[in-house]
């Protein structure tokens, strides 16, 4: 049995994190062989059944990669007698040979969120998302199996096209984020006081602007007691807009933009937060929300799906489009220690439902089950 991974598009953290965890739990099947096309930055396990294959083409270029997937990969699949081609990036640009089944995955929600797409200025990025919408729909409608990572995302796609065979397998939470009940060293760059934490890249649909506006409406007493810490790259246009708002509202010293923090350094920030906040309105599986819950600290969160699907009763919810609503929920949370204790306990219980080992085993089960189906046309 041979499964080929086309993971050449997995160049950023989220896509690589998924694959690293998946390969950590490779099944014990002796007849299983796994071939992986992936960037050299993706560290693969030293496993006898996992083999990295380097394309002869310079596939770092997305156009060259698309041509390689269309013209070269089919012949490789045929020569290797592959049973399954898995494209976790969500785009299938390869016509698999007879007998080789195709699996894709839906992770990128932006091409299917019209509000977000309209917020992107006219140009290549806007065109790219328009094209991705159509290419991904085609990929999912033609695949032998589509893996969804939230029921909400599945409902969106199934309202737009017929999916032959689908399964929902949410992402897990890395053990490094499960700091509740333990202790972590408090980073020196954190304020000595309690703080409210929001970790996310700066973009319009992350609603930092509305969050800062809401924070500015809190009482001076609450603002002095609980500074707002924003973690994310600050060299983006939306970050500049937020910086300008902080200055206009006179919140310097109370709203702190720490910039980008390495992924592995985030757990102590969640762990030491008095309150975690997540205000995104466009997600597929909100990893930041899950990782924050795993710290056992209380959470207030966007009420836009799929956030309630993952947060359940472990968060207080607000409309990310309404700074007054955000402010009211923020004030309620910061003024109610008993409520926060309940949310903290609920966060621990909810986060325990999401585990990378469970995610990986379910995924391998589906891949192997598909591979074992009788081949058609041979």
At which residue positions do the language-model features occur?
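Active-site donor-binding acidic/aromatic loop of nucleotide-activated sugar
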Residues: 237-239, 252-262, 269, 316-317
């Amino acid at each position: 049995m041979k499964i080929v991974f086309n993971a050449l598009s997995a160049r950023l953290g989220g896509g690589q994190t998924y694959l690293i965890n998946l390969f950590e739990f490779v099944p014990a099947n002796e007849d299983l062989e796994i071939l992986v096309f992936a960037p050299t930055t993706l560290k693969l396990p030293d496993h006898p059944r996992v083999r990295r294959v380097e394309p002869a083409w310079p596939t770092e270029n997305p156009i060259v990669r698309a041509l390689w997937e269309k013209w070269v990969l089919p012949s490789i699949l045929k020569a290797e007698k592959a049973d399954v081609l898995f494209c976790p990036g969500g785009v299938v640009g390869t016509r698999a040979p007879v007998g080789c089944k195709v699996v894709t995955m839906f992770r990128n929600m932006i091409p299917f969120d019209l509000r977000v797409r309209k917020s992107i200025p006219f140009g290549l990025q806007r065109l790219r998302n328009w094209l991705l919408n159509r290419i991904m729909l085609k990929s999912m409608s033609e695949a032998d199996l589509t893996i969804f990572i939230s029921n909400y995302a599945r409902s969106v796609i199934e309202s737009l096209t017929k999916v032959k065979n689908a399964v929902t397998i949410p992402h897990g939470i890395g053990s490094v984020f499960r700091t509740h009940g333990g202790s972590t060293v408090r980073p020196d760059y954190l304020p000595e006081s309690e703080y409210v934490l929001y970790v996310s890249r700066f973009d319009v649909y992350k609603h930092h602007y509305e969050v800062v506006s809401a924070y500015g409406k809190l009482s001076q007493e609450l603002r002095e007691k609980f500074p707002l810490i924003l973690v994310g790259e600050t060299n983006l246009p939306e970050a500049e807009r937020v910086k300008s708002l902080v200055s206009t509202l006179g919140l310097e010293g109370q709203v702190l933009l720490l910039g980008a923090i390495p992924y592995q350094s985030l757990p102590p920030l969640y762990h030491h937060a008095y309150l975690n906040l997540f205000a995104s309105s466009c997600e597929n599986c909100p990893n930041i929300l899950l990782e924050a819950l795993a710290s056992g600290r209380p959470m207030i969160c966007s009420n836009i799906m799929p956030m309630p699907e993952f947060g359940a009763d472990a968060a207080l919810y607000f409309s990310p489009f309404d700074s007054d609503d955000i402010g009211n929920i923020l004030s309620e949370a910061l003024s109610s220690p008993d409520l926060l204790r309940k949310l903290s306990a609920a966060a621990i219980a909810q986060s325990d439902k999401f585990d990378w080992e469970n995610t990986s085993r379910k995924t391998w089960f589906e891949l192997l089950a598909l591979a074992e189906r009788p081949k058609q046309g041979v």
